[in-house]
Amino acid sequence: MATKLQDGNIPCLAATPSEPRPTVLVFDSGVGGLSVYDEIRHLLPDLHYIYAFDNVAFPYGEKSEVFIVERVVEIVTAVQERYPLALAVVACNTASTVSLPALREKFDFPVVGVVPAIKPAARLTANGIVGLLATRGTVKRSYTHELIARFANECQIEMLGSAEMVELAEAKLHGEDVSLDALKRILRPWLRMKEPPDTVVLGCTHFPLLQEELLQVLPEGTRLVDSGAAIARRTAWLLEHEAPDAKSADANIAFCMAMTPEAEQLLPVLQRYGFETLEKLAVLD
């Protein structure tokens, strides 16, 4: 079986939810960003968290770059109008690769993006073969290829783009079983290789939600690498050194873009992650 790469022991701070805490937005097109939020919360439990997901335009992997940039800026603006933000995390690889410049130009608070963990994977691989598992959009974008050229030019990079895996992760959080046969079919190009990747980059924030199932399908000894812990450390540093004094004593809250039955069914899941309520955010559909 494969193994999940651990990032070491991360200290936790005592939470004081009744006091004003820095407000941090974690945004994704779907629920994949919860994997990043979980890493940040583990390191920084005493923040006021907002989780926003775009269930109207989900998934972003097949959308144009222009659409994604305009949409993400619009949503972050709408959240900022409700709650002044100390920091925002774009917990979506696809959105991060195209929207960060526009967000950083518009807002005066730090904006953290998520990029595939190519650099650490290149350092970890023993056989020199690294797999990148991401959306088709992330696989195709020039930013991803620039990361590979910069940090993994001596490695053999095998890329798989899958929208279906995003859907599988969403379904899992809705309580559905994940088909191992479906994962085997998606991963077939690697599973058929004489020497498959020994290190796999989870290049979509949805995919850590499937790590348990991936461990059952990938060859024994395969390492899974994602950027969640690194994003948490970056968030902590920015909050200490560069973030504005934007705080709230309110409870953590989640926003969807449309209050559909599917979104309502996510409330128990969101509550397990510490978000007491789910509201519709007023943006143009």
From Swiss-Prot:
Could you tell me the EC number(s) of this protein? 5.1.1.3
Name the active site residues.
C92, C204
A single GO molecular function term of this UniProt record: glutamate racemase activity
Binding-site list for substrate? D28, S29, Y60, G61, N93, T94, T205, H206
InterPro entries named among the record's database cross-references = Asp/Glu/hydantoin_racemase, Asp/Glu_race, Asp/Glu_racemase_AS_1, Asp/Glu_racemase_AS_2, Glu_race
Recorded catalytic activity of this chain's protein: L-glutamate = D-glutamate
Q: Could you name the domain of life of the organism this protein comes from?
A: Bacteria
Keywords carried by this UniProt record = Cell shape, Cell wall biogenesis/degradation, Isomerase, Peptidoglycan synthesis
According to its UniProt entry, the protein's GO biological process terms are: cell wall organization; peptidoglycan biosynthetic process; regulation of cell shape
Q: Does the keyword Cell wall biogenesis/degradation apply?
A: yes
Q: In which pathway does it act?
A: Cell wall biogenesis; peptidoglycan biosynthesis
* Role noted for this protein: Provides the (R)-glutamate required for cell wall biosynthesis.
According to UniProt, the name of this protein is Glutamate racemase
Species in which this protein is naturally found: Escherichia coli O6:H1 (strain CFT073 / ATCC 700928 / UPEC)
Q: Which gene encodes it?
A: murI
